[in-house]
Each structure stands twice: as structure tokens, then as C-alpha cells.
Amino acid sequence: MEKYTNWRDNGTGIAPFLPNTIRKPSKVMTACLLGILGVKTIIMLPLIMLYLLTGQNNLLGLILKFTFSWKEEITVQGIKKRDVRKSKHYPQKGKLYICNCTSPLDAFSVVLLAQGPVTLLVPSNDIVYKVSIREFINFILAGGLDIKLYGHEVAELSQLGNTVNFMFAEGTSCNGKSVLPFSITGKKLKEFIDPSITTMNPAMAKTKKFELQTIQIKTNKTAITTLPISNMEYLSRFLNKGINVKCKINEPQVLSDNLEELRVALNGGDKYKLVSRKLDVESKRNFVKEYISDQRKKRK
């Protein structure tokens, strides 16, 4: 792995795009696991159909728990567990929440938190794209490099007043060892929240305060993916291990121009383990090309 030093942060030593070392199950084990999944899917088919018709998030939770042994642990910063109220402390309609991304399953994680229908957002070069759950999953499984192929542009937050809105601000996935630089600037994020600031007096616009909450998502390493991977291979990774997710809903942060406060919050409050801004989506694109090329050479 030393050859990938171009994609290792000089300050922290973290290589955010390197895949985790995961032992693949045997073909026999994979076949057995997929067979069990098929049986579970048939059993849950009525609930799956009902979820597709109603979009009720609690139904999705039941499906995931039975089918994939999904377990989740949710904490709200500053609130004792016994005092947490979903109607007050969980993500609400009309609001925007900033999330990190390590896995296509992050889409399910935020849906289970949401107190209403969900919109998923992924920025790229200051343009915000809206994607469905399926589009988000396909995007991450394809390597998380070209969101414009999966979603469509959305101009402002006011268009999403009837949904709970989650933005995966890094614009791609990483291995969870740090938080990548965002694919949207502070200026553009503020304009997305309130386009009227573009017509304000510059001095007045500068004094306008914006606050957002972040949601830090952690999952077991078998579910984390930074590289293109097939649906079948991805399923086989975690079917025998189950899925364990931890979500932390952080306190609101006042937005700065560089949005570093949001990255720090998503990184568990550790600003010293943030990778540099050069390790962005374009850097990942180059890493993926070289890594896949090297893997092909090894197989020859």
C-alpha cells in the first residue's frame, strides 16, 4: 500500500480512499448466505410491498432488522438517552442535515432517523443533486464519482419543504478514517439554504447567521466501500456479519466560509485527523483508476 502515498495525507498519515482489508467468504458460504437471504426476502415480501406503497420508515426498519440483522445505536449530543424525543430531537421536515458517507447503507441509516419522507442530496462542484435511495446506493456502489449521472439538480432548500433533507457533503464515500473536504463551499451552501443573500448588501449578508446540524454515521467495516463493487459481492460481505450502525446527531453549528466546523463535528470533534483539501473527489477518481489498474495486473 506504500505506493499510494499520493493519496495519503501528509499531516495525519491517513489514506481515506484505501479499502479496508476484508476476508471474502467462500463461494459455498456465499451461496448459502444468498439462499438464506432469498428465503428471508420471500417471508418479508408483504412488508416490502407495503413499504413501497406507503414509504413508512418504521416498516423499513423491520425489514432491515429481519433481513440483514440490522442494529442501530442513536445518540443525540447534549441530551440524555431517556430524555430523547423523536418528535423534537430527530431530523424534521423542511430542515437540512449534513452527513458523512462511508457506505451505500448510509441512505437507510438517515431514512430510519427521519421524521417524515426523505430527500437525499449530494453536491458536486457547488451544484446540489437530489437522488432517490436506489440512485444513492447505485452511485456509491459505482465508486461515488459522478453524481450527475444519478441525480438531478435542485436549486434551493425551499423546494424541499415537505421532506427531511440529508446532504452527504463530501460528495463521495471514504473509509471512515477521516472526513473528506466538502464538494460545496460555505458560500454556495448558504445560498442553497437562503438564496436571498445573493441580493443583500455584502455587509448585511456577512452578518446573517446560518446554523446546521450534522449527523455522524459509523458502520462496521464490512459495509464500508470506497471502490466500485458489484451488488452480489457487496451483499456477500456483510450477510454473515450483520450490520451495526451508530448515528450521532450533533448540536447545531454556525456556518463559516470554509465549513470546517461541520467537518470537525462529523469527525467526532477531532480536527487533527481531518485530511487536507487536496484529497477530494477528483483525487479519489485518480486513486480508483490506479488501484483498479494495479489489481488487474496482479490477476494476470
Swiss-Prot record:
It catalyses: a 1-acyl-sn-glycero-3-phosphate + an acyl-CoA = a 1,2-diacyl-sn-glycero-3-phosphate + CoA; 1-hexadecanoyl-sn-glycero-3-phosphate + (9Z)-octadecenoyl-CoA = 1-hexadecanoyl-2-(9Z-octadecenoyl)-sn-glycero-3-phosphate + CoA. One of its GO terms (biological process) is intracellular triglyceride homeostasis. It is an enzyme of class 2 (transferase). A motif (HXXXXD motif) lies at residues 101-106. It comes from the Eukaryota. GO terms for molecular function: 1-acylglycerol-3-phosphate O-acyltransferase activity; lysophosphatidic acid acyltransferase activity. The keyword Aminoacyl-tRNA synthetase does not apply. This is Lysophosphatidic acid:oleoyl-CoA acyltransferase 1. The lineage of its organism: Eukaryota, Fungi, Dikarya, Ascomycota, Saccharomycotina.
